[in-house]
Amino acid sequence: MIPTVKELLSSKLEGQAVTVKGWVRTKRQTKSAVFVEINDGSCMANIQCVFDQEKVAEPALAAEFEKTTTGASVSVEGVLIASPGSGQKLEVKANSLRVIGEAPAEAYPLQKKAHSLEFLREIAHLRPRTNTFGAVARVRNRMAFAVHQFFQERGFNYVHTPLITASDAEGAGAMFQVTTLDLARIAAGGAVDYDKDFFGKPAYLTVSGQLNVETYCQAMNRVYTFGPTFRAENSNTTRHLSEFWMIEPEIAFAELEDDIALAKDFILYLVKTALSDCADDLAFFDARIQPGLIDSLGKVAKGSFSRMTYTEAVAELLKHKGVFEFEPYWGCDLQSEHEKFLTEKVVGGPLVVTDYPREIKAFYMKQNDDGKTVAAMDVLVPRFGEIIGGSEREWRLDLLEKRISEVGLNKDSYKWYLDLRRFGSTPHAGFGLGFERLLLYVTGMTNIRDVIPFPRAPRQADF
């Protein structure tokens, strides 16, 4: 393989013949030279290829330059030399150029000008060629790798959980149904005979891999899943997607304190990795998207987490009545504005909130002795709010059966899950981190549809 632009710019190949392949970002000329900037997505930087005007005037090269427009894919050959300019250390003194794929200027939508993020969402198949979305893609790649690094280094096993399920892990009912039945006939007749459906019963796209990964936790101790999940919530907001990726570890013989320690270590690992390995891309986001981003991440990386119970958090919020759009009260689900206020105004840094009311949390969370709260925790960070949600799981069979009945779930659908409590049950805990929400936080992007390659949301399933 030929070297990438990133490899060339960091190489010791000065004075050697090189080949550059990529996409044209800009072409400009002076009386003595023509400058072509090429990017191949391997890094934020372009590599500058310089052609003498005399060379460009040669008929064969002149014909290629006619087709050399922004967006065209090209192959350039030349010698890597020290650059006299201030913008880069190295450039290519070029002697040949070949256009591989044309991008006619009158049709190519990504010309050399600023494009709104809204416009770029309409051309999601081309937006990776912009600086912003190239940077997002590289950070996404590095963070995904870091997720696996973190858990593999700590003895966790990676488990592939199913995308099609008959169980609702959250008990919320906002699930996409999977069927091979003729929907037109169902609409006409009204009744649904699931015996004739593919699985012989109602089946859905998973909202979480947690329940499934718990089965392996109860056999292999430390496990995690990292895959796509689906929610059929009609939420057209900057923080919701219908398809997104979730990271969900589970640890056996563990309680809430173990869960909190793991979550804190995980956040610190990811933030430090982003700062060290994505420096150029974060510098771009800091300059163009979220001023102060690097400083904000740096403060989190120092590792100081405050802690309070949900009850204490609500008490703090009630001291500031009139500040919030949604007034807090004990029993409310904390809103993003509450979480940001707690982290930015009350404690001035990351915060772990524990012991939430059981009525606003999932059925599988361990009930505390007070009968009102569960052994749950959320990790909140400044500028964003909740980034991780987790809990100790209810491992006592009688209490879990009772809770399933209380929330109106079909106990038969959870027989296999209850079996984990019937046979060799252990205290265990875990958490979930929405991968796209992590990326929003690390990049400073403000719309979750801009940190996933092809966003899926209500009325949006293009590409």
Please report, for each region that a protein language model flagged, where it lies by residue.
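Class II aminoacyl-tRNA synthetase-like tRNA-binding/catalytic domains
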Residues: P3-A252
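Hydrophobic (often cysteine-bearing) scaffold residues that line and stabilize catalytic clefts
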Residues: K67, L90, V136-V147, D259-A263, ...
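Short coil/turn segments at secondary-structure boundaries
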Residues: Y108-L110, R140, N157-I164, Q218, ...
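Catalytic cores of large soluble enzymes that bind and process phosphate-bearing ligands
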Residues: A135-V139, E255-L262, F305, E392, ...
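Metal-assisted phosphate- and nucleotidyl-transfer catalytic regions
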Residues: D168-M175, T180-D193, D265-V381, E406-T426
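TRNA-recognition modules of translation machinery and tRNA-sensing kinases, especially anticodon-binding
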Residues: G200, Y204, C217-P228, L241-E255, ...
